């Protein structure tokens, strides 16, 4: 199959298996959920009554005070006491096979092509690391919410995009399923397309 280059009167021949396969919604969902789960820190932690610092002495005698009976200041019922079912640090990551991960990326890229959300260009750059230059270039191309993928990370482009809302710049090795579906449009250079093809082959 061929992808038309927007900034040139030519087309780029690409693999049908990478850019023309059927959309596997279940696979994409599983991989996206796993990717997002892997990004969780999982560092939350609370203390049980056994871990609270303080005396183990009974606050007051069992009977005769008129107050409710109490055996410990660390009781979960008390303010600043322990937590009954205390949260523990945990690893939320899920195992995803390489074949599944690559299959999900291929499904997403193919769907982007079908929905006309993938724009392929010969090259994409700015002369200087100026936000104004990139903003004007995107405006000329009628792009707002966009992920830009280049063969190698262009420092000028990266710096120019840092202060633009809903614009991100990645190199071909830095793509992931969440980023690909998070933006309205994806701009890829011809070099990036070839690199992604090799990576997913």
Curated annotation (Swiss-Prot):
Region Disordered: list its residue ranges. Answer: 46-71
**UniProt keyword list:** Ribonucleoprotein, Ribosomal protein, RNA-binding, rRNA-binding
Keyword set includes Hydrolase: no
Any single GO BP term: translation
Reply yes or no: does the keyword rRNA-binding apply.
Answer: yes
Q: Name one GO molecular function term.
A: structural constituent of ribosome
Q: Which GO terms describe its cellular component?
A: ribonucleoprotein complex; ribosome
- Similarity-based family: Belongs to the universal ribosomal protein uL4 family.
Outline the subunit composition.
Part of the 50S ribosomal subunit.
Q: What does this protein do?
A: One of the primary rRNA binding proteins, this protein initially binds near the 5'-end of the 23S rRNA. It is important during the early stages of 50S assembly. It makes multiple contacts with different domains of the 23S rRNA in the assembled 50S subunit and ribosome. Forms part of the polypeptide exit tunnel.
Q: What is this protein called?
A: Large ribosomal subunit protein uL4
Q: Please give the organism.
A: Klebsiella pneumoniae subsp. pneumoniae (strain ATCC 700721 / MGH 78578)
Q: Which gene name does the record give?
A: rplD
């Amino acid at each position: 199959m061929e992808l038309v280059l927007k900034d040139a009167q030519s087309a780029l021949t690409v693999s049908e298996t990478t850019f023309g396969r059927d959309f596997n919604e279940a696979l994409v969902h599983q991989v996206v959920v796993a990717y997002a789960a892997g990004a969780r820190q999982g560092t939350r932690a609370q203390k049980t009554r056994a871990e609270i610092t303080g005396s183990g002495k009974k606050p007051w005698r069992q009977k005769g005070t008129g107050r409710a009976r109490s055996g410990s200041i660390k009781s979960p019922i008390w303010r600043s006491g322990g937590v009954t079912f205390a949260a523990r640090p945990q690893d939320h990551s899920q195992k995803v096979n390489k074949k599944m991960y690559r299959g999900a990326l291929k499904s997403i890229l193919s769907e982007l092509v079908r929905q006309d959300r993938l724009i392929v260009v010969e090259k994409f750059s700015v002369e200087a690391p100026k936000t104004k230059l990139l903003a004007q270039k995107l405006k000329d191309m009628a792009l707002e919410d966009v992920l830009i993928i280049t063969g190698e990370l262009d420092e000028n482009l990266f710096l120019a995009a840092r202060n633009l809302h809903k614009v991100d710049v990645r190199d071909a090795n830095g793509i992931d399923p969440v980023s690909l579906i998070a933006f309205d449009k994806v701009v890829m250079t011809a070099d990036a397309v070839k690199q992604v093809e090799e990576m997913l082959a």
